[in-house]
């Protein structure tokens, strides 16, 4: 039995779960998420808990068991509390500005970059050097954060660029510069 897969998923009050074959839809205060799960894995609701079961101990079923349980648990957590990633922008003149369509980023290029936020993801900037990405889907929040970070990754000499909050950028010494 998978250590992760066998744990039941608690369903908080105010969250409804609809299971239709291999499709699971979770509705809550932060929105609605749907996902088609692997056909072999069975998700069932018993009271205020969801249980994930696998048909056999085949290697493939073992691998999908824990994955499916975590995907469903992330859906439940997403519609109740949501997910959040914080990006920090470092560098002279590097900044973020929030527009109705998403974010306008100045990252040291000759032009500003317009980043359009996908549906279900909100981008805010409490100050010009911090970008907060929030949403119900952990996958989408992480993907948006990774895409914005990839526009200008932190470089190792001065540390300029976009990094995750708490990320440690390994620094390098510059050239010796002697005669």
UniProtKB/Swiss-Prot annotation:
Record-linked InterPro entries: Ribosomal_uL6-like, Ribosomal_uL6-like_a/b-dom_sf, Ribosomal_uL6_a/b-dom, Ribosomal_uL6_bac-type, Ribosomal_uL6_CS
Keywords, sorted A to Z: Ribonucleoprotein, Ribosomal protein, RNA-binding, rRNA-binding
Organism the protein comes from: Gemmatimonas aurantiaca (strain DSM 14586 / JCM 11422 / NBRC 100505 / T-27)
Protein name: Large ribosomal subunit protein uL6
Lineage: Bacteria, Pseudomonadati, Gemmatimonadota, Gemmatimonadia, Gemmatimonadales
Presence of the UniProt keyword rRNA-binding in the record: yes
Pfam families: Ribosomal_L6 (PF00347)
GO biological process: cytoplasmic translation
GO cellular component labels: cytosolic large ribosomal subunit
Record HAMAP family: Ribosomal_uL6_B
């Amino acid at each position: 039995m998978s250590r992760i897969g066998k744990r039941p998923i608690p369903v908080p009050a105010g969250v409804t779960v609809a299971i239709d074959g291999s499709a699971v839809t979770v509705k809550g205060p932060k929105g609605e998420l749907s996902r088609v799960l692997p056909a072999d894995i069975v998700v069932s609701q018993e009271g205020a808990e969801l249980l994930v079961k696998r048909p056999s101990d085949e290697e493939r079923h073992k691998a999908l068991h824990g994955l499916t349980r975590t995907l469903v648990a992330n859906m439940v957590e997403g519609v109740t509390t949501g997910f959040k990633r914080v990006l920090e922008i470092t560098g002279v003149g590097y900044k973020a500005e929030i527009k109705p369509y998403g974010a306008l980023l100045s990252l040291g290029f000759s032009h500003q970059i317009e980043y359009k936020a996908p549906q279900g993801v909100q981008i805010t900037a409490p100050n010009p050097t911090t970008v907060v990405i929030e949403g119900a889907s952990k996958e989408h929040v992480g993907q948006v954060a990774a895409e914005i970070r990839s526009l200008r990754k932190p470089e190792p000499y001065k540390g300029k660029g976009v990094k995750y909050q708490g990320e440690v950028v390994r620094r390098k010494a510059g050239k010796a510069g002697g005669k």
